[in-house]
Regions:
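Transmembrane beta-strand segments that form the barrel wall of outer-membrane beta-barrel proteins
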Residues: 192-208, 232-234
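Short glycine/proline- and aromatic-enriched beta-strand/turn motifs that initiate or cap beta-hairpins
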Residues: 22-94
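Predominantly the C-terminal beta-signal and adjacent terminal strand-loop region
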Residues: 209-259
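Extracellular/periplasm-exposed beta-strand and loop segments of Gram-negative cell-envelope proteins
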Residues: 48-75, 95-123, 149-174, 203-204, ...
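Residues that define the transmembrane beta-barrel architecture of outer-membrane proteins
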Residues: 34-36, 74-78, 120-124, 138, ...
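Short loop/turn motifs that connect adjacent beta-strands in outer-membrane beta-barrel proteins
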Residues: 23-36, 133-140, 187-192, 222-223
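Cleavable N-terminal export/targeting peptides
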Residues: 1-35
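Residues on the lipid-exposed face of transmembrane beta-strands in outer-membrane beta-barrel proteins
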Residues: 40-42, 80-86, 126-130, 144-146, ...
Length: 259
């Protein structure tokens, strides 16, 4: 919690130079109408990754990677939120995909052998939405949908100065239902607002719990909005007595383009 508060304090300060009064023609809070409306939001998520593996009550392994460590191994990444509404009904999708490539390294005690590991992870959230509450200062959607998580890993072994080698790949996928809330609250009469998101789900395909939260601060413009905040995703799965957890958290920044 202290980390989130500290992050948001710094982020809020970075927006302090923007105009405090509301500008004409700017829609800070979305309004329900009988026409189609929507937004496309590409964003950057500087996430850390933590996790653990346990058998029954015995912890077998744990990992903790900082954002700078992850960035140095990224081959490709895409992060995008899409949403569309007609009246109070709507739909949304949140897409996170990353391909990481570990540096080649010699295998201990085997100087003629080297390995290269590639990991692809996709986190896809799809939901139907319904606007529960809407005023000039507050917007609140309820949502229900699914979260799909895919992980594909591949390790290649190579014998130095030869064509010989071996490879092994593994793929895992899980789908779990989720439900939650999302929206924004306007700050006074300005174009500043607080965006928020929370969902929780699980109890399907071995997924015990999956939950995601985001809170931040944003500024609305005629074309859309700029937001910065803190995002966290937690997932716990259990199968055949083996429990795995994964936690992704970090600063998120995006530009939302309205249409």
């Amino acid at each position: 919690m202290k980390k989130i508060i500290s992050t948001l304090t710094i982020l809020a300060g970075s927006l302090a130079a923007l105009p405090a009064q509301a500008a004409e023609g700017v829609q800070t809070i979305p309004q329900v109408t009988n026409e189609w409306r929507g937004a496309v939001t590409p964003y950057i998520w500087a996430t850390t990754i933590g996790g653990s593996v346990a058998y029954e009550e015995t912890k077998l392994a744990s990992v903790d990677y900082r954002a700078r460590d992850i960035i140095s191994h990224i081959n490709f990444a895409a992060m995008l939120t899409l949403e569309a509404h007609h009246g109070r009904l709507g739909a949304m999708a949140d897409i996170v995909f990353a391909k990481l490539n570990a540096q080649k390294s010699e295998i201990l005690g085997k100087p003629n052998l080297s390995s290269n590991t590639t990991v692809e992870q996709g986190i896809y959230t799809f939901a139907a939405t319904y606007t529960i509450y809407n005023t000039k200062n507050t917007y609140l959607d309820g949502l229900a949908g699914v979260r799909v998580m895919n992980v594909v890993s591949r390790t290649d072994l190579k014998v130095a100065d030869s064509v010989y080698g071996a490879s092994n790949s593994n793929a895992k996928s899980s789908t779990a239902p989720i439900a939650g809330l999302k929206g924004r609250v306007r700050l006074g009469d300005s174009n500043y607002f607080i965006p928020f998101y929370i969902d929780v789900g699980g109890m399907a395909q071995g997924t015990q719990v999956t939950t995601q939260q985001m809170i931040g601060i944003g500024h609305a413009y005629e074309w859309g909005a700029a937001t910065i905040g803190f995002k966290n995703l937690y997932n716990r799965q259990k199968s055949s007595g083996i429990t795995t957890t994964q936690s992704l958290s970090g600063v998120v920044a995006g530009l939302s383009i309205r249409f």
